[in-house]
Curated annotation (Swiss-Prot):
Trichothecenes are sesquiterpenoid toxins that act by inhibiting protein biosynthesis. Pathway: Mycotoxin biosynthesis. Keywords: Acyltransferase, Transferase. This is Putative 15-O-acetyltransferase SAT12. Belongs to the trichothecene O-acetyltransferase family. Residues 7-36 have a biased composition (Low complexity). It is an enzyme of class 2 (transferase). The keyword Acyltransferase applies. Its EC number is 2.3.2.-.
Length: 573
């Protein structure tokens, strides 16, 4: 099942709560490998002291007009050369528009508006056009981030035209992305994706056909994770609003004449220079918590998971939508049972754990030792102190981890009639406890900022997933036992998609140029990890499993995702 598929889940689909609860607590047992916590987790990795001056912008030795800096933090992780060249962790956001009555529009005209909008956006916020280069570090696989300005207006226009692609096609967004991946794999030497490509597509005869009122137009944003983190989704809304304003004012044929070169002064300042707390003021408490988070992150690859296959596969997403009515019931149940400080993100993470235990039960031999370290990305921007006129869309990612020792003990107790709800209560409380611990410790941000080359070199075996090309080496995952397990550990709460873009797009005149039918995204997974992302749209909860079909089948992926949704629904019965 591809990401355009959406199977609503409604409480009317099953007859009664008791039968539904029974249906999601039983599963035929499966054979599992020993994935228990080792007695000796290994020596603590000591990271070198960071010097902010090592990571500042400076001229590229080969061309002084080009500025560059060393990658740091999560940039180093997602920027490992081979992985980035294959598109590991490239992500997308798809905005579905419907043309309003107040607009004479074609795909060609729409492109001109987006080209102008892109030039304006880059001049104001040049970091959106940075790119990665490799080969200057001692560790050749780690990148530098570079920025190069334009020498002429025509060069700027050519860049923007190359960024914006229009297609008159009946293909879906997932099919268009699959086409691009196929072409990429056909290259003799795979190349990293552009920082950002935008495909504007509609099911019309040609690019100059009028887009009649009510026509669906998709804007597909394709991001290279080296340059963007999840906040890049907000740029999609910014650019659509810019283009809407340009169309409303009929200025799409008037290209800007910016003073290129001046924008360099507006590049995002290096992370270490704008951290809320200076590195040299960190004390023993920081060192202790830092070590704890580091060791926790290193245990992720040893955690319990789902059975793993190793075949060539495709990056896919399964999107499971819960009806608005049922989503409201789930939200109300969380508040009623857990209190106002809890949200559906805590419940969703808890339900993911139960689904994992159901789809791969822990055998008696490891009941006391199997564990789960579940990482989650955290927005690091609250830990920065900087005055900005434009958003920081580049990587500013912190980290946290939910730790569940003796994982089997967190499962559903069969002797309790309310076993599902009680288990979800306990897990949600533990999830929130661990969330709060890391979110109230600046350590989470310090750690990601400290992901230097030395750490990446040590941790790449755990964090880097094997590529599923036919000739790829077959490496072990987790403890390396006879039964490998997929990295199904992470849960990401993306919040409300409504916070990214409004339901309608208006120009300065007040005219409604577009309705916004949908806004959704996903991440390309080329290796043996997988994770659940949760968001809402029009108050309906959506669960998206990002995975690779070479690791486990669509049937297993669908079963796992459906069970997460069913556990969340069971909480409201």
């Amino acid at each position: 099942m591809l990401d355009d598929d959406c199977s609503p889940t409604s409480s009317s689909e099953m007859s009664n709560a008791s039968s539904r609860e029974a249906s999601i607590t039983s599963r035929s047992s499966s054979t599992s490998g020993n994935n228990s916590l080792p007695e000796d987790r290994g020596a603590v990795v000591q990271l070198p002291t960071l010097n902010p001056s090592d990571y500042r912008w400076h001229p590229f030795p080969g061309d002084s007009s080009v500025l560059q800096r060393k990658a740091i933090g999560v940039e180093a992780l997602v920027g490992i050369r081979d992985a980035n060249s294959r598109g590991e962790y490239d992500f997308y956001n798809n905005i579905v528009l419907r043309v309003g009555n107040a607009l004479e529009l074609t795909l060609t005209r729409l492109k001109r508006a987006f080209v102008k909008a892109m030039l304006d956006a880059r001049f104001e916020n040049p970091s959106i056009a940075c790119y990665g280069v490799w080969g200057q570090n001692k560790e050749q696989y780690l990148p530098h981030i570079q920025y190069k300005s334009f020498k002429s207006q025509s060069e700027a226009l050519a860049w923007a035209n190359n960024c914006i692609i229009i297609q008159a096609t009946s293909l879906t967004g997932s099919e268009l992305r699959a086409e691009r991946l196929k072409k990429r794999r056909a290259q003799a030497v795979p190349q990293p994706s552009n920082p950002l490509d935008i495909i504007i597509y509609a099911d019309v005869a040609n690019q100059r056909n009028r887009l009649e009122p009510g026509t669906e137009v998709n804007i597909l944003f394709l991001f290279n994770h080296l340059i963007w983190d999840g906040k890049g989704r907000y740029f999609t809304s910014e650019l659509v609003q810019r283009a809407t304003t340009i169309l409303d004012q009929e200025k799409e044929n008037i290209m800007p004449t910016h003073r290129w070169g001046e924008e360099k002064s507006r590049l995002d300042p290096p992370i270490l220079d704008v951290m809320l707390v200076n590195l040299d003021k960190m004390g023993p408490d920081y060192d202790l918590a830092h070590r704890k988070l580091l060791n926790s992150q290193l245990q992720v690859g040893l955690s319990w998971g789902l059975p793993l296959t190793r075949n060539p596969g495709e990056p896919l997403q399964i999107r499971h939508c819960i009806s608005r009515e049922d989503s409201t019931k789930i939200t109300d149940a969380v508040r009623a049972r857990l209190g106002p400080k809890y949200n559906i993100g805590h419940l969703g993470h808890a339900a993911t754990v139960l689904s994992l235990l159901k789809n791969n039960p822990i055998p008696p031999s490891t009941q006391d030792t199997a564990f789960l370290f579940s990482p989650l990305p955290v927005d690091g921007r609250p830990y920065l102190l900087e005055e900005r006129k434009t958003p920081r869309y580049g990587n500013a990612q912190a980290a946290a981890v939910v730790e569940l020792q003796k994982l089997a003990s967190w499962g559903i107790k069969s002797d309790n009639l309310n076993g599902v709800k009680v288990a979800l209560d306990d897990l949600a409380k533990k999830v929130k406890e661990d969330y709060d611990y890391w979110l109230t410790n600046l350590v989470a941000w310090r750690f990601k900022s400290s992901c230097t080359s030395e750490f990446i070199a040590f941790g790449s075996a755990i964090y880097q997933t094997p590529y599923l090309d036919p000739g790829a080496p077959k490496v072990k995952v987790g403890t390396g036992t006879s039964t490998d397990m997929v990295f199904l550990k992470a849960f990401c709460n993306d919040g409300r998609a409504e916070s990214i873009i409004a339901y309608t797009m208006h120009g300065p005149s007040g005219k409604e140029l577009f309705q916004v039918d949908d806004c959704f995204g996903g991440v390309d997974v080329l290796g043996s990890n997988a994770f659940i992302r949760m968001d809402t749209w029009k108050d309906a909860i959506r669960l998206t499993l990002c995975y690779n079909s070479g690791c486990f089948s669509d049937a297993v992926a669908n079963s796992f995702t459906t069970d997460v949704a069913q556990y969340m629904l069971a909480y409201s019965w």
